[in-house]
């Protein structure tokens, strides 16, 4: 009845990151950290999980002798996000049907 949700995106922080990246061309680590209220360590771990899944690309470079990490969503990430949204909508549709039957 219920389809399994993408375990990579079914994490609050990873879903927040993908939601941010889908609306921008690219985002710096500090911007993502600020918008998600994540700690640097936790965010770094979650970004690596998204990267390993092929959902984002991470670019590390130096700007004025300071490290600069930026991220952008991949086509795979966009497709995964769109499917995740569809799957959640399907969940809600099933729940609505079940609730309607109970009335």
Please describe what each predicted stretch is.
Residues 1-2, 79-103:
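Amphipathic alpha-helical dimerization/coiled-coil segments
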């Amino acid at each position: 009845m219920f389809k399994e949700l993408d375990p990579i995106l079914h994490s609050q922080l990873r879903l927040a990151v993908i939601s941010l990246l889908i609306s921008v061309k690219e985002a710096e680590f500090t911007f993502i950290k600020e918008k998600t209220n994540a700690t640097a360590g936790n965010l770094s771990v979650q970004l690596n999980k998204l990267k390993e899944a092929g959902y984002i690309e991470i670019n590390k470079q130096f700007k004025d002798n300071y490290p600069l990490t930026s991220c952008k969503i991949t086509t795979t990430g966009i497709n995964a996000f769109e499917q995740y949204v569809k799957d959640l909508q399907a969940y809600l549709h099933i729940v609505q049907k079940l609730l309607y039957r109970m009335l």
